[in-house]
Amino acid sequence: MSGRSVRAETRSRAKDDIKKVMAAIEKVRKWEKKWVTVGDTSLRIFKWVPVTDSKEKEKSKSNSSAAREPNGFPSDASANSSLLLEFQDENSNQSSVSDVYQLKVDSSTNSSPSPQQSESLSPAHTSDFRTDDSQPPTLGQEILEEPSLPSSEVADEPPTLTKEEPVPLETQVVEEEEDSGAPPLKRFCVDQPTVPQTASES
């Protein structure tokens, strides 16, 4: 009997966890792919991370425009980490917890902001700026080639198709035979009854 109650408790906890995650996802409307360090290791993965809305950034910027931290970053970075903390749960996986830890470490240890980091915090430049270009992969990881367009344009714009003139099948087959340099392939016709007979004889 105790096994059933444990399973029921686990199911109810899982349902609660799902509700929390879904509520957090509802709050986050934008996601972007970033290179993220996993835990205390040097391993970096390319994964989706939540981005706060520009309205929320403007509100927090107007509230804390006079209150800047000594390292030059606005206190908006703490709002980002608190949003990610809401997204976390005690039973969540390790990499998402390390994301929050990495954000806190980045915002507290940088003494002078680079121009790229200051651009990423201002809401006016968020659409033009790509953070994955500023973070190269570490050893052992492949460099992924991406189109030069921002991710929002790539996702929204369907691929354009160009119409080519149809080439007759006979000329196409002749060109293939000439290009390959190999002897011509045997062609079987469905209309001829000799093909199944030769196959059955051998």
Swiss-Prot record:
One of its GO terms (molecular function) is actin binding. GO terms for cellular component: chromatin; GBAF complex; nucleoplasm; SWI/SNF complex. Ubiquitous. Residues 90-99 have a biased composition (Polar residues). Keywords: Allergen, Apoptosis, Differentiation, Phosphoprotein, Williams-Beuren syndrome, Wnt signaling pathway. Positive regulator of apoptosis. Plays a role in the Wnt signaling pathway, negatively regulating the expression of Wnt signaling components CTNNB1 and HMGA1. Involved in cell cycle progression, maintenance of the nuclear structure and stem cell differentiation. May play a role in lung tumor development or progression. This is B-cell CLL/lymphoma 7 protein family member B.
